[in-house]
């Protein structure tokens, strides 16, 4: 069997690496991939333009691809999954309609209210002056969000009206997030602890994966600008068994049943970004794909086949599928380029010291091979990921791996996993 993974980040390296471990898989293609996927056994990069759906379809037919796993959000929002499925190709990912849960904050907030899914109070605006006028009527802190896709960076927490006006100006006037900021959502600030809840969904069937917790802000202690994610760990102790059931009953099932009611049943990974306080849950956002960097610590804990899991969902056989996880804990630390999450440096040559430990794995993200050398090509460059007997052990191993990576301007957060170690 041949598998195609769409994307080029650390998430896609982890998905391709896991897919290649399946004995029924002879080859995994990654489009376009990165330096890490280029160096893996059974994995090949292909220079497909993933915005040209015809090219992806033709490649799948030519290579007899039996499963396409779509990693990033943009191709899903553009409708790649529908297009491939309509052409008889097994594409694992939601429809263009369902992907609006991530593609438009306004769509998702309206959906939450309509289907009784707990979330923060909000208002949506496509006019700068109307949005500024709204700022006079609300309490602070507040949260200003770009409506569209902004690589996880379009969320600004504002302590007062001045900061909120500045955020609106950056989105509407300065186009800091391009077209994603043509409409904004202003919502109540929620206090509590965040957790990532990711499940595999097929119509009304929801199979949760192990829990995880991301670290969005760029600085230690969760300060500074929001990023795509500076690291993650699994499991997240805040998500107890009781809370797990509450999330399924109050968030996941109402979401998938709501989409069925609207005539667009969900297929794919569904990721709920949650705020938890006093055992109550509210949805911050939905992502219609695996999180990055949560994928890396989750995939390293997965013992059973990712490919068979996706195929079971495509066949609507999730209710009879079981997932096998290691009891070990995992921790993934992102190594980023100087300047990230703003303008960052690239084309820095990377040196990687040898390591020999089956409990650790270096997933590449923003890397490419140039003149037979690995060089940086993105804001987030690697995710050093490790298994351990407990979180502290996994954290120690991950940071030991970080120490083996070197390039000019490299930095990471030194406290990934701190909330889970108390």
Where are these regions (language model features)?
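Generic C-terminus detector
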Residues: 367-371, 376-422
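Active-site "cap" helix and flanking loop/linker of ATP-utilizing ligase/carboxylase catalytic domains
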Residues: 248-270, 287-359, 370
């Amino acid at each position: 069997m041949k598998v195609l993974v769409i994307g080029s980040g650390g998430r896609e390296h982890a998905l391709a690496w896991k897919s290649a471990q399946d004995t029924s898989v002879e080859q995994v293609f990654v489009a376009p991939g990165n330096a890490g996927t280029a160096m893996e056994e059974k994995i090949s990069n292909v220079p497909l333009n993933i915005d040209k759906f015809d090219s992806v379809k033709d490649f799948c037919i030519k290579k007899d691809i039996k499963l396409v796993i779509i990693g990033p959000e943009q191709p899903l929002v553009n409708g790649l999954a529908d297009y491939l499925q309509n052409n008889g190709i097994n594409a694992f990912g939601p429809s263009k309609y369902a992907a609006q849960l991530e593609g438009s904050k306004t769509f998702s907030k309206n959906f939450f209210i309509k289907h009784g899914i707990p979330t923060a109070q909000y208002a949506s605006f496509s006019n700068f002056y109307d949005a500024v006028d709204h700022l006079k009527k609300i309490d602070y802190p507040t949260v200003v969000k770009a409506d569209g896709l902004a690589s996880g960076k379009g969320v600004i927490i504002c302590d007062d009206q001045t900061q909120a006006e500045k955020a609106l100006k950056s989105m509407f006037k300065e186009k800091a997030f391009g077209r994603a900021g043509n409409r904004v959502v202003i919502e109540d600030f929620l206090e509590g602890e965040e957790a990532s809840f990711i499940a595999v969904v097929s119509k009304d069937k929801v199979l949760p994966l192990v829990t995880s917790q991301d670290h969005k802000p760029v600085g230690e202690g969760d300060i500074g600008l929001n990023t795509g994610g500076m690291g993650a760990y699994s499991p997240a102790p805040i998500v107890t068994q009781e809370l797990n059931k509450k999330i399924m009953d109050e968030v996941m099932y109402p979401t998938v049943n709501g989409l069925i009611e609207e005539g667009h049943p969900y297929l794919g990974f569904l990721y709920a970004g949650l705020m938890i306080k006093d055992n109550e849950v509210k949805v911050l956002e939905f992502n219609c794909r695996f999180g990055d960097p949560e994928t890396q610590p989750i995939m390293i804990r997965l013992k059973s086949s990712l490919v068979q899991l996706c195929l079971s969902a495509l066949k609507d056989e999730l209710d009879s599928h079981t997932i096998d996880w290691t009891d070990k804990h995992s921790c993934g630390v992102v190594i980023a380029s100087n300047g990230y999450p703003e303008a960052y440096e690239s084309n820095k040559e990377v040196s990687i010291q040898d390591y020999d430990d089956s409990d650790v794995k270096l997933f590449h993200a923003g890397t490419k091979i140039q003149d037979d050398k690995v060089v940086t090509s993105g804001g987030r460059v690697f995710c050093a990921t490790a298994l351990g007997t407990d979180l502290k052990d996994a954290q120690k191993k991950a940071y030991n791996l970080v120490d083996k990576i070197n390039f000019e301007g490299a930095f990471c957060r030194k406290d990934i996993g701190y909330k889970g170690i108390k």
